[in-house]
Amino acid sequence: MSTVQFNEMIALPNSEISQAIIQTEKELFQLQFKKATRQPFKPHEIKKAKRRLAQLKTILTSRLDALEKKRGNTVMKLIKKQNYMTGNF
């Protein structure tokens, strides 16, 4: 697997980020399984997989938070508008 920079990950759409999260979790599981069964593996790959997983989840979470905040602001505006129109402040 080639190393993808964080700036390149940000440009990915949400669907690709979700797929990358699943793929990275599988990779991390396989590496941990190799470690537990004392099969040959490269220990630094576990660190890279954990870091990549954290970065991908951070990007996805920040996007979802921004979307939720945007929706929340819209809902609050509608509620305030409705309260203003009905006289319920």
UniProtKB/Swiss-Prot annotation:
- Any one annotated GO CC term: cytosolic large ribosomal subunit
Enumerate the UniProt keywords alphabetically: Chloroplast, Plastid, Ribonucleoprotein, Ribosomal protein
List cystine links.
Answer: none
- GO terms of molecular function: structural constituent of ribosome
The family database entries (PROSITE patterns) matched by this protein are listed as: RIBOSOMAL_L29
Q: Where in the cell is it found?
A: Plastid, Chloroplast
InterPro entries per the record? Ribosomal_protein_uL29, Ribosomal_uL29, Ribosomal_uL29_CS, Ribosomal_uL29_sf
Q: Does the keyword Ribosomal protein apply?
A: yes
Q: Which Gene3D superfamilies match?
A: 1.10.287.310
**Its GO biological process terms?**
translation
Q: In which domain of life is the source organism classified? A: Eukaryota
The record's similarity note reads: Belongs to the universal ribosomal protein uL29 family.
Protein name as annotated: Large ribosomal subunit protein uL29c
From the broadest rank down, the organism's phylogenetic lineage runs: Eukaryota, Sar, Stramenopiles, Ochrophyta, Bacillariophyta
